[in-house]
Amino acid sequence: VTGSNGKTTVKEWLYQLLQPDYNTVRSPRSYNSQIGVPLSVWQIGSKTEMAIFEAGISQPDEMIHLEEIIKPTLGLITNIGEAHQEGFQTIQQKCIEKLTLLKACDCIIYDGDNELICECVEKLCFGCREIAWSRKDRDKPLYISKIIKGNDSTKIEYTYLQYHSYI
């Protein structure tokens, strides 16, 4: 999991969804740096079925090192914003650097409503399965039609490749 914001929240949410059915490890807290990622990877044991790691950067050429350690097969980018922008010349440069984590993934998941991310994904031509989610475009593979917030839960209604469901 990478992005400017929301990495830890998404990682924890995925862990809560996957952990009951799979032997899953995750990076502790916000261990997403050159030091934190190797410490996180050490948790993988012989019985681990899934591992969820977050990767964060603050300057160019950092993500390739994290990609070599994590070697993700499925990647997710949350968003691109101004956080840690001082190390980059442009926000596009930062987006491309973050997407370096996903270069060898079998599948990448990203915000299909974010023009910058879409442009960078297209520019990099990953050649893997892409799942773009959207709250605006019903033609995206994953269309989120409704979010209902309750007192103790949130229900998300979605359509994935013509299959309608909710979580």
Regions found by a protein language model. Name each.
Residues 1-128:
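Phosphate-binding loop of NTP-binding sites
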Residues 92, 127-167:
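Adenine nucleotide phosphate-binding catalytic loops in nucleotide-utilizing enzymes
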